[in-house]
């Protein structure tokens, strides 16, 4: 009787954090809460491949004083790609202020969202 050993490696899912606002939840602590969540992402083993910022979440990638700016910068340094919606940056007149990550477009965002597991905060 022969024994066969098969090693099964768990499939790691590609993930994207999709941010629609510059805060998590609602209320007075939402801005600082999101900064804490983003900071906690640095500690997890399976970091997301992308963080996508749309609507007023782009303010986090353009304002160095925003509580979430540093965690986003740290995530970028750890290899996470940070993308900001170009139309949103244009609407808020923030294109020239983009200081972390890259400007993206609707096509690229949809390509990523349809091929990655999404985390929304």
Q: Where are these predicted regions, by residue range?
A:
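Conserved mixed alpha/beta catalytic, RNA-binding, or beta-rich assembly cores of soluble enzyme
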Residues: 1-65
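Glycine-rich anion/phosphate-binding loops
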Residues: 31-32, 101-103
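A glycine-rich helix N-cap at a beta->alpha junction
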Residues: 67-91
């Amino acid at each position: 009787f022969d024994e066969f050993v098969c090693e099964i490696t768990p499939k790691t899912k590609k993930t994207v954090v999709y941010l629609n606002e510059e805060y998590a939840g609602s209320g007075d602590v939402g801005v600082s809460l999101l900064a804490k969540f983003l900071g906690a992402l640095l500690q997890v083993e399976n970091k997301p491949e992308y963080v996508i910022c749309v609507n007023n979440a782009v303010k986090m990638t353009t304002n160095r004083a925003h509580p979430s700016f540093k965690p986003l910068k740290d995530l970028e340094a750890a290899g996470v790609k940070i993308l900001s919606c170009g139309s949103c940056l244009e609407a808020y007149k923030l294109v020239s202020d983009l200081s972390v990550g890259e400007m993206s477009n609707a096509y690229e965002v949809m390509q990523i969202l349809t091929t990655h597991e999404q985390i929304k905060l």
